[in-house]
């Protein structure tokens, strides 16, 4: 327990930016869900067991349109397909996490993946507990935000337009932090070029997954050149 608390204290400061974003986005999700006639228990269930922001927002649209369960499942898989790329790149770090592994796989969101690649535990801090703490903290923020949003939204109505930009802003900050911490920026520029080209060719609806696959392939094929 002492080792876990040590790792938890080390991990918490790194998650503060996610805390702010997840609370706002979680509250937005909760408010939108109750506006469709669902109560806080549905918001809590989805945030506990689905825990995928984009999928949860898409699910609201599909549920309001009375889409079939099969359609919901297919769209969810397509929207979250990019997580496969994240999981593959984390295999080495997750392989010795023992009982934590199922939860770490479940809690690997875009933002958690970014933090795990940006920060490392201090000397003397267990990496397994550090990774677990970051994942648990981020998940807790999302659950709390969703719950508060659904409870508040049950009694008051809010204009949530523009709130989705919060997560985009967080990603920009995380990218800039990682960029400043490293001297080799080849990977960063490769990712930017691939993303821009894919956006121009495939549009906003399809570019993300294609760009991620191409990035992974490029990193595998040109690993030595990029590390020089």
Swiss-Prot record:
GO cellular component: plasma membrane
Location(s) in or outside the cell: Cell membrane
GO BP of this protein: L-valine transmembrane transport
Tree of life domain: Bacteria
Main location: membrane
Transmembrane portions of the chain: 14-34, 42-62, 130-150, 156-176, 192-212
InterPro entries cross-referenced by the UniProt entry: Brnchd-chn_aa_trnsp_AzlC (IPR004471), Brnchd-chn_aa_trnsp_permease (IPR011606)
UniProtKB keywords: Cell membrane, Membrane, Transmembrane, Transmembrane helix, Transport
Transmembrane listed as a keyword: yes
Topology relative to the membrane: Multi-pass membrane protein
Family the UniProt entry places it in: Belongs to the AzlC family.
Protein name as it appears in the record: Uncharacterized membrane protein HP_1331
Taxonomic lineage of the native organism: Bacteria, Pseudomonadati, Campylobacterota, Epsilonproteobacteria, Campylobacterales
């Amino acid at each position: 327990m002492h080792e876990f608390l040590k790792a938890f204290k080390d991990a918490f400061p790194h998650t503060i930016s996610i805390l702010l974003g997840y609370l706002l986005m979680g509250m937005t999700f909760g408010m939108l869900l109750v506006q469709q006639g669902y109560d806080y228990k549905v918001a809590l269930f989805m945030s506990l067991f689905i825990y995928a922001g984009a999928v949860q927002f898409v699910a609201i649209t599909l549920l309001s349109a009375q889409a079939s369960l099969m359609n919901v499942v297919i769209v969810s898989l397509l929207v979250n397909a990019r997580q496969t790329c994240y999981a593959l790149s984390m295999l080495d770090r997750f392989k010795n996490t023992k009982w934590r592994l199922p939860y770490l796989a479940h809690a690997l969101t875009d933002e958690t993946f970014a933090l795990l690649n940006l920060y490392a535990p201090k000397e003397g801090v267990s990496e397994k507990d550090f990774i677990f703490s970051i994942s648990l903290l981020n998940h807790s923020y999302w659950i709390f935000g969703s719950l508060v949003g659904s409870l508040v939204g049950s009694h008051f109505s809010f204009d949530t337009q523009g709130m989705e930009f919060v997560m985009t802003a967080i990603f920009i900050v995380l990218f800039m932090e990682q960029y400043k911490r490293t001297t080799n920026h080849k990977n960063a520029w490769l990712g930017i070029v691939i993303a821009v080209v894919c956006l121009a060719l495939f549009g906003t609806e399809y570019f993300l997954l294609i760009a991620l696959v191409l990035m992974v392939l490029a990193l595998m094929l040109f690993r030595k050149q990029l590390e020089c």
